[in-house]
Amino acid sequence: MADQHLHIVSFDVPSPPNYGGVIDVFYKVKALSELGVKVQLHCFQYGRPKAKELESLCVSVHYYPRHTGKHQLFNSLPYVVLSRRSEALVERLLQDEYPILFEGLHSCYYLGDHRLQGRLRLVRAHNVEHDYYTALAKAEGNAFRRTYFINEARKLQRFEPVLSEADHVLAISPKDEAYFSGHFRSVKHIPAFHACDKVEVPDGLSDFAFYHGALGVAENDQAALYLVRKVFKDLPVKLVIAGSFASGELKREIARAKNVELRENIGTEEIHRLVRQAQVNVLPTFQATGIKLKLLLCLYTGRHVVCNTPMVEGTGLAELCHVHDSPEAMRTSIISCIGKPANGQAIELRARVLEERFSNRRNAEAIVRLLR
């Protein structure tokens, strides 16, 4: 059988895989490579260096600078799309007839380009982007950034019909699949790719709860503040919060709390170690969009997971978590989990559900079938 080649256009450099979107891209590239797919990776670059590790997974890796001038905010196209354009990218794509996978609506500037007519084109939909940006606006305290998110949400909704140019739209969650199927043809649910091969939950007990996230993102800042102020206030359980770029407000709240510790700007390996060591991974969110990759990490490698409904909404994973929507119920659940090993039927169910639905290899094989 002839080699299967695939161009992947990524919105960012996907290594190191240390935040939601790039985790999906990195482990997708890895899984496809392990199946023998010859991946030609194209990355838009801003703030993240070139990554040597990608060269061992791909036959070629190309980098393109993002055009980040503020004057582009006044264009009718979304800033996140307009800033990811490069004639050098198109020229490389035109050198052969291989299929193209565009990662996210952000990278779809050339999806409808007449020069790519006739090519097999796929889009990985990481979110319903206008919903995601609307939720970011609601969580944002800074007036300028809130206005930016509102405008960007409107532009992304207007731009979204470009997905009709794709031969296949790969939705990341069942909820997103239902949305995109109402607007576009050939929509398929391909679950998120992630770092874990099998469910491995530590034995024994620990004595702390853990929350992690990119704290500079308003959604995560809001979740961390909720935990410190509402859930862990005067709770006889230690909470460790890890992430980068914590807000001044969050730092002040943590300084006042005797049972909360901040671990800032630590590496991915240390995050993974804390997920495994914690007795409870607490994962509130106020944004029910896509699927949170940190939820998968915690279910594969952590003990108990306590979260709220938006974290699991539309994912099919609610039965694997302790789901509570009030601070009081969350507090009670955390105290219950602190004294209880994570084992038995609950972990067997986790293994059955996750290894059936979130197998990187099986989901990569589903993508390969679409390329033929």
Model regions: which residues?
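N-terminal subdomain of nucleotide-sugar transferases
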Residues: 1-60, 95
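A charged, aromatic-enriched C-terminal amphipathic alpha-helix characteristic of glycosyltransferases
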Residues: 84, 341-372
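Membrane-proximal helix-turn-helix segments that form the acceptor-binding/catalytic region
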Residues: 88-94, 129-132, 140-169
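Short N-terminal targeting/anchoring amphipathic segment
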Residues: 91-109, 120-122
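Active-site proximal beta-strand in glycosyltransferases
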Residues: 100, 116-139
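Donor nucleotide-sugar binding/catalytic pocket of nucleotide-sugar-dependent glycosyltransferases
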Residues: 149-199
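Conserved catalytic-core segment of nucleotide-activated headgroup transferases in glycan assembly
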Residues: 189-256, 261-276
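Acidic donor-binding loop of glycosyltransferase active sites
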Residues: 275-290, 301-303
